[in-house]
Amino acid sequence: MEFVMKQALGGATKDMGKMLGGDEEKDPDAAKKEEERQEALRQAEEERKAKYAKMEAEREAMRQGIRDKYGIKKKEEREAEAQAAMEANSEGSLTRPKKAIPPGCGDEVEEEDESILDTVIKYLPGPLQDMLKK
C-alpha cells in the first residue's frame, strides 16, 4: 500500500513540507550560482545583440549596393523629397496644399471636348466648317 501511495503522489511528499512552510534546504553556494547564471545570461544576450547588429549591418550594406546599382532611393528619402516639394508649393499660400492631380485626369476632358466639337463641325455646311476650323 505504501508503494502505491508513493507512486501516486510521486515526489510530491518531499515538497509538501516546503509548500506548507517547512524549512527549505539552504545551499551555501546558491547565491553564487544564481549570480553566475545571471552573468552568463547577460553575456549570451550581449553576444546575440552583437551578432544581430552585425548581420543587420551586412544586410543594409547589400541593400545599399542594390539601391546604388539600380538607382533606387530609400523610402525615407522619397518621402522627404515629397514633403519638401509640398512645403515649397505652399510657402506663400494661406490654405492647405492641394493634392497632386494624377496625369491624364484633366487631359481626357479636353480631348472629349475636341472630339465633340469635331463631330459637330462635320455636320455643318462646308463654308461654316472652314470658318470654324480657322
Swiss-Prot record:
Subcellular location: Cytoplasm, Cytosol; Perikaryon; Presynapse
SUPFAM superfamilies: SNARE fusion complex
Residue runs in coiled coils: 29-69
Region of interest called Interaction with the SNARE complex, as start-end residue ranges on this chain: 48-70
Family: Belongs to the complexin/synaphin family.
Subunit and partners: Binds to the SNARE core complex containing SNAP25, VAMP2 and STX1A.
Function: Positively regulates a late step in synaptic vesicle exocytosis. Organizes the SNAREs into a cross-linked zigzag topology that, when interposed between the vesicle and plasma membranes, is incompatible with fusion, thereby preventing SNAREs from releasing neurotransmitters until an action potential arrives at the synapse. Also involved in glucose-induced secretion of insulin by pancreatic beta-cells.
Annotated protein name in UniProt: Complexin-1
Species of provenance: Macaca fascicularis
